[in-house]
Structure formats: structure tokens, C-alpha cells
Regions:
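Canonical Rossmann dinucleotide-binding motif of NAD(H)/NADP(H)-dependent dehydrogenases/reductases
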Residues: 3, 7-39
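Substrate-binding pocket helix/loop in short-chain dehydrogenase/reductase
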Residues: 100-102, 106-114, 206, 210
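A short, exposed helix-loop element centered on a Lys and neighboring polar residues
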Residues: 125-126, 172
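Alpha-helical segment proximal to the catalytic Tyr-Lys
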Residues: 130, 176-180, 238
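Catalytic loop of short-chain dehydrogenase/reductase
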Residues: 142-166, 171-172, 176-180
Length: 254
């Protein structure tokens, strides 16, 4: 699928976090097809070089980075700016440590998911805003939530769901704060997506039960997350901010 390259993305830099994973790597390829120069960001163990080889175009870079280490956030945008003006952040990075009942959740489960999914989101968004404002860029931030923010999570994912609810609230609050500077903040809220996070944390029976609740009768592919991200990151959505795009195959209707 080819994305239009006339909506402010072609020739400019974008940052994609979680770029070594299923959704993040698909989003990175979508931006590359739109003509962007992509900075791939993920934890050091992620296969960033493998993803880099799949991108069309030139000027792409990788940056291994633990987003829970806030000191590294400024380096992300400085690195991306080496290639071209940074116009967008697609923050796809997230972690579901494990599925656990409420009684089985440990402090380590809580801390990791809140640190990565909420704390890193807030501070990375703030750093993106500072970079955009300093450079006079009307940039766009696209965060990733989950339908769990609305449902409370399925199958032992209450902490993950809570952290994604925080992403929705912060997206709205940050959108309001950044709007006077012309900087937009939106979120994509996927339902079930065919990635290791989804399929690797459930039994076949649990997965079949989950899929049975999706009106479209299947999981999404990672590539089906790309269109909403490209739209929200580009000037095609220049008057859209503070919104949450529900991409769940009809499972979540509100």
C-alpha cells in the first residue's frame, strides 16, 4: 500500500518508537512509503537493523533506547533532526509484562507497565513539544492506547489497561496544552492486532474467545494500524487534536 506523500511528511523526519515490534515496524514502513526519513527507536535488544533493511527511501536511522530512562529523550529528537526537520512522533512503544489476576500482580508488574506505558509517554510527548516549539514546527504526536482503556482489559491485563487509560487522558490534556503552539496530539486505540503481544500472551482458547467478540471476525494486521497513524501525523488532519481513533474492527463502539 502506498501512502500519499503530499501531506507534509515527504522529505521530513519522523520518530517511531517501538519500531522493532509488529505495529511499530509497520508504522515505520508506512512513513517511509510516504517519503519520510524515519528514526527507528526501540530497546537495545529489538531487531532495528532488520526493520531498517525493509524501509524504502533513504535517510533512515536507528537509535537503541530504553524509553524508561528519561535522560535519553532529548537525544531522540536531536538524532532525528540530523536527517531533516522533525515533523511527527509516532509513539508505538508499550509493554504488557504478563497476564495476571489482580491478586497475582506484583510491584514489578506495576512499575514496568506504568513506567513504559505512562511515564515515558508523558515525558516523551513533552520533549517532542519542546523540540517542535524551539524549531517553529507545527508538529504532530500520535500516541498508542488500547481498547483496554475503555473495557478495563481482558484476560488478566488490568494494569496494562489502566496504563492505556492514562495514555488517553494524557493525550487529551497534552493536546489542550500544546494547541496554542499549533502542535497536535492524538492517539490510536487498537483492538486485537496479530502481534506477539496479543497472540503470545494467551492460550488458543482465550484467543478464540477474544476474536469471537470482534464483529469483523478476525484480528487486525499491524499494517491496518498504519493508515490512521499516517492520517493523524500528516497535514491531512491539520485541525484534529485530542482525539482517539478507535481501530478495533467494531469490537468497541461508543
Amino acid at each position: 500500500m502506498k501512502w500519499r506523500n503530499d501531506a507534509g511528511l515527504a522529505g521530513n523526519s519522523v520518530v517511531v518508537t517501538g519500531a522493532g515490534g509488529g505495529i511499530g515496524s509497520a508504522v515505520a514502513r508506512g512513513f517511509a512509503e510516504a517519503g519520510s526519513k524515519v528514526l527507528l527507536v526501540d530497546i537495545p535488544s529489538a531487531p532495528l537493523n532488520d526493520v531498517l533493511k525493509t524501509l524504502t527511501g533513504t535517510g533512515h536511522q536507528i537509535l537503541p533506547c530504553d524509553l524508561s530512562d528519561l535522560k535519553g529523550h532529548v537525544n531522540i529528537f536531536e538524532k532525528a533532526a540530523e536527517a531533516a526537520e522533525v515533523v511527527a512522533l509516532a509513539h508505538c512503544a508499550a509493554v504488557l509484562r504478563r497476564r495476571a489476576t489482580v491478586d497475582d500482580v506484583t510491584e514489578e508488574d506495576w512499575d514496568l507497565q506504568i513506567d513504559v506505558n505512562m511515564k515515558a509517554t508523558f515525558f516523551l510527548n513533552r520533549t517532542a513539544h519542546a523540540h517542535f516549539k524551539k524549531n517553529g514546527t507545527k508538529g504532530s504526536i500520535v500516541n498508542f492506547s488500547s481498547q483496554g482503556w475503555w473495557t478495563g482489559g481482558f484476560g488478566g491485563s488490568v494494569v496494562y489497561a489502566g496504563s492505556k487509560g492514562g495514555v488517553v487522558s494524557m493525550t487529551k490534556g497534552l493536546a489542550r496544552s500544546f494547541a496554542p503552539d499549533g502542535i497536535r496530539v492524538n492517539a490510536v486505540s487498537p483492538g486485537g492486532v496479530d502481534t506477539s503481544m496479543m497472540t503470545g500472551n494467551q492460550t488458543p482458547e482465550q484467543l478464540a474467545s477474544f476474536v469471537s467478540m470482534i464483529p469483523m471476525g478476525r484480528l487486525a494486521t499491524p499494517e491496518e494500524m498504519v493508515g490512521p497513524v499516517i492520517f493523524l501525523a500528516s497535514q491531512a488532519s491539520s485541525f484534529v487534536t485530542g482525539t482517539v481513533a478507535n481501530v478495533s474492527g467494531g469490537q468497541l463502539m461508543y
